[in-house]
Amino acid sequence: MVLRQLSRQASVKVGKTWTGTKRRAQRIFIFILELLLDFCRGEDSVDGKKKKDSLTDKTETVTEKKES
């Protein structure tokens, strides 16, 4: 009987720590995904402003030249 109680208590402790570990891992994973998303969008992580993309600037000028 005592062994059964001890094993249940141990499994509860392991379950709680595993839940905390999963939550922490999920938070880290979400942070990395958001960081990658910001990087792919071209936003600067320091001030949140978009960086100028030279490729889009070039395509805009080429498009403007074709229209006129």
From Swiss-Prot:
One of its GO terms (biological process) is monoatomic ion transmembrane transport. It is a single-pass type II membrane protein. Phosphorylated by host PKC. Phosphorylation alters the stability and may also have an impact on the subcellular location. The modification Phosphoserine is found at residues 7, 11. The keyword Transport applies. Residues 1-24 are cytoplasmic. GO terms for molecular function: channel activity; DNA binding. Keywords: Host cell membrane, Host cytoplasm, Host endoplasmic reticulum, Host membrane, Host nucleus, Host-virus interaction, Ion channel, Ion transport, Membrane, Phosphoprotein, Signal-anchor, Transmembrane, Transmembrane helix, Transport, Viral ion channel. It is found in: Host cytoplasm; Host nucleus membrane; Host rough endoplasmic reticulum membrane; Host cell membrane. Residues 44-68 are annotated as: Disordered. Residues 42-68 are extracellular. The modification Phosphothreonine is found at residue 21. InterPro entries: Polyoma_agno. Pfam families: Polyoma_agno (PF01736). The chain crosses the membrane at residues 25-41. One of its GO terms (cellular component) is host cell plasma membrane. Its main location: host cell. It comes from the Viruses. The keyword Membrane applies. Belongs to the polyomavirus agnoprotein family. Alters the structure of the nuclear envelope by interacting with host CBX5 and disrupting CBX5 association with LBR. Involved in the perinuclear-nuclear localization of the capsid protein VP1 during virion assembly and maturation. Plays an important role in the release of progeny virions from infected cells and in viral propagation, probably by acting as a viral ionic channel in the host plasma membrane. Allows influx of extracellular calcium ions in the host cell. May contribute to viral genome transcription and translation of viral late proteins. Homooligomer. Interacts with VP1. Interacts with large T antigen; this interaction may impact upon the activity of T-antigen on the control of viral gene transcription and replication. Interacts with small t antigen. Interacts with host CBX5; this interaction induces the dissociation of CBX5 from LBR, resulting in destabilization of the nuclear envelope. This is Agnoprotein. The lineage of its organism: Viruses, Monodnaviria, Shotokuvirae, Cossaviricota, Papovaviricetes.
